[in-house]
Amino acid sequence: MAMNFVTFNQDYSYLAVATAKGFRIFTTDPFAKSYETKEGNIAIIEMLFSTSLVALILSPRRLQITNTKRQSTICELTFPTTVLAVKLNRKRLVIVLEDQIYLYDIQTMKLLYTIETSPNPSAICALSPSSDNCYLAYPLPHKAPPTSFTPPSHAPPGNTHISPTSGEVLIFDTLKLEAINVIEAHRSPLACITLNSDGTLIATASDKGTIIRVFSVPDGHKLYQFRRGSIPSRIYSMSFNTTSTLLCVSSSTETIHLFKLSQGQSSESSLPSPSAPQRSMSQSSLSNSPDEDETSGDKDSSEFHSRKHNGTLMGMLRRTSQTVGSSFAAKVGGYLPKGVSEMWEPARDFAWIKLPKSNPGPGGNGNTGPLRSVVAMSNNTPQVMVVTSDGNFYVFSIDLSKGGEGTLTKQYS
């Protein structure tokens, strides 16, 4: 059965799957089916933590809020254009259209605010699960061209160009209903953003997918900068663990990367919070730091096999050169300005997972494109949960002290 949509709930204790014939809800630890209905072609499903309330998109423009325990419909809403994403926490319901975002009070379903955005066909948006730090993040809208704008002579007649999503993130306080900051995260357009469970950190990736950055929220100070690799790749999913010590990232390379967030690795020293909302553009963010076009070794794709030869002469030479390089960078970096020293010390993944090759079974989607995946980390054990577009659910164990390659411990399909 084809999967239309798959997502974890806010604390990763449940997994929800939307299909062409209803939806299913599973517990993640242990993995077991919790609820199933075979009615309706469900395009999108979102849960509210572990409650019986779910938000469903039944047709392109129609939202239905359902109580699965009572098997009743709480309300239905119809929107002017296709609903591309739904986000919710205990205070707010967020509906994302291509060029609008609707904010609702989830208790009363009263419309609180409508945000006009630039075209956002990928529905890049993140809502904090926290009721206190109830922040919404989305790409900063582009300024509209002046009415007197004249297209260049070489432009085709009637040609209209829609600018791509910006690389800047707007932070919106959904309780105060006001924009509070803009984070200039990337030079390239955004591809993926996510907030941690406390609403105090945001991770960003651009459409090149080589650099992952983590900023504090709401002040927008850059705390970490990670290199996924040098080969451009589409980032499909990013997820913090509940303690915000690890960041898990999946992409079109079929390699899952885990980055460690520790105080010693922070690329920023302690900075005072701004006294008023402002555009956050630290020199470490864009102007003096390496960006997506920087070249470096990559552990993905064809180069991944090099990990398996660490006992060979080449492996020893590689480790030696890396050790010398890191030591040299640490010494030299101490004499350089902060923005320059970052170029010497790109932070790599702490651990990684290679997804097994598999053919989609009867429950897979049969797509021939890149294997898409959604990732989350277990609350109780050092494990990474991965759901793939071919209908598989994997659980990998991670060594939190040594890192390295994760071990597949469970698989369901």
Swiss-Prot record:
L/FRRG motif (motif): residue ranges: 226-230
Ranges of Basic and acidic residues composition bias in the record: 296-305
Keywords: Autophagy, Endosome, Membrane, Protein transport, Repeat, Transport, Vacuole, WD repeat
Placement of WD repeats on the sequence: 1-36, 69-114, 141-182, 185-225, 230-269, 308-354, 366-406
Low complexity compositional bias, start-end: 263-289
Localisation per UniProt entry: Preautophagosomal structure membrane; Vacuole membrane; Endosome membrane
Top-level taxonomic group: Eukaryota
BP-aspect Gene Ontology terms: autophagy; protein transport
Signal peptide positions on this chain: none
GO cellular component, one term: phagophore assembly site membrane
Region (Disordered): 263-315
PANTHER family: WD-REPEAT PROTEIN INTERACTING WITH PHOSPHOINOSIDES WIPI -RELATED (PTHR11227)
Subunit structure: Component of the PI(3,5)P2 regulatory complex.
Domain notes: The N-terminus might form a beta-propeller domain involved in specific binding to phosphatidylinositol 3,5-bisphosphate (PIP2), leading to the association of the protein to the membrane. The L/FRRG motif is essential for the cytoplasm to vacuole transport (Cvt) pathway, for the recruitment of atg8 and atg16 to the PAS in nutrient-rich medium, and for its recruitment to and dissociation from the PAS under starvation conditions.
Its job: The PI(3,5)P2 regulatory complex regulates both the synthesis and turnover of phosphatidylinositol 3,5-bisphosphate (PtdIns(3,5)P2). Necessary for proper vacuole morphology. Plays an important role in osmotically-induced vacuole fragmentation. Required for cytoplasm to vacuole transport (Cvt) vesicle formation, pexophagy and starvation-induced autophagy. Involved in correct atg9 trafficking to the pre-autophagosomal structure. Might also be involved in premeiotic DNA replication.
Protein family according to the UniProt entry: Belongs to the WD repeat PROPPIN family.
This protein's name: Autophagy-related protein 18
Species lineage: Eukaryota, Fungi, Dikarya, Ascomycota, Pezizomycotina
